[in-house]
Swiss-Prot record:
Entry cofactors: Mg(2+)
Residue sites binding GTP per the record: 30-37, 57-61, 75-78, 142-145, 175-177
Gene Ontology CC annotations of this record: cytosol
Homology family: Belongs to the TRAFAC class TrmE-Era-EngA-EngB-Septin-like GTPase superfamily. EngB GTPase family.
Domain EngB-type G: 22-194
Entry-linked SUPFAM superfamilies: P-loop containing nucleoside triphosphate hydrolases
Full protein name: Probable GTP-binding protein EngB
GO molecular function: GTP binding; metal ion binding
KW DNA damage (keyword) present: no
Length: 194
């Protein structure tokens, strides 16, 4: 897919705020600071469309980005950040759960995991939850540029120990925002699910 136009549309916290134009949507989930905003900026070739931060927990709403007037990428709040209150964490969880369970336009979940670390308990829970909801999943191993060649060659096996990548509705993609590794394959997956 050639990206010619991308725009931030809305930050939403409830269904009444979601876009109403029935375009396919793809949610990006992962722990805080896993690289969701960097991935968005890289795949649409815009440096500052999605705000990146060194401070975890910045995204606190569902952020809808329209691509080519054909689809939405939906950046959801990162999970696992300890400095967010339990009350806020519960609210984020409820907002994400409502979105994943009720949004008819949702065509896939892009689950980002940091290639340098094993998937967290939260990653495993999100993965299993999407499987339960029968949502197609693309597991994206971010920050591949930070791995040594030997580590990079074994990344699918490493992540596959925690996440069942052999499930029918699951795909896997190593990714780097620095080297732009697999941007085309990312869009191939999106187009296949539309």
């Amino acid at each position: 897919m050639k990206v010619v136009d991308t725009e931030f549309v809305i930050s939403a916290v409830s269904e009444k705020q979601y876009p109403k134009d029935d375009l396919p949507e793809f949610a990006l989930a992962g722990r805080s600071n896993v690289g969701k905003s960097s991935l968005i900026n890289t795949i649409v070739n815009r440096r500052k469309l999605a705000r990146t931060s060194q401070q975890p927990g910045k995204t606190q709403t569902l952020n809808f980005y329209k691509v080519n007037n054909e689809l939405y990428l939906v950046d959801v709040p990162g999970y696992g950040y300890a400095k967010v209150s339990k009350k806020q964490r519960a609210a984020f969880g409820e907002m994400i759960q409502d979105y994943l369970e009720t949004r008819a336009d949702l065509k896939g979940l892009i689950l980002l995991v940091d290639a340098r670390h094993d998937p967290t308990a939260d990653d495993i829970n999100m993965f299993n939850y999407a499987l339960y909801l029968d949502i197609p999943i693309l597991v994206v191993a971010t920050k591949m540029d930070k791995l040594k060649k030997m580590e990079a060659s074994q990344i699918k096996q490493k992540i596959g120990k925690s996440l069942d990548l052999k499930q029918e509705n699951v795909s896997f993609l190593p990714f780097s925002s620095v080297s732009k590794l697999n941007v085309d394959k990312f869009w191939d997956w999106i187009e296949d699910k539309m």
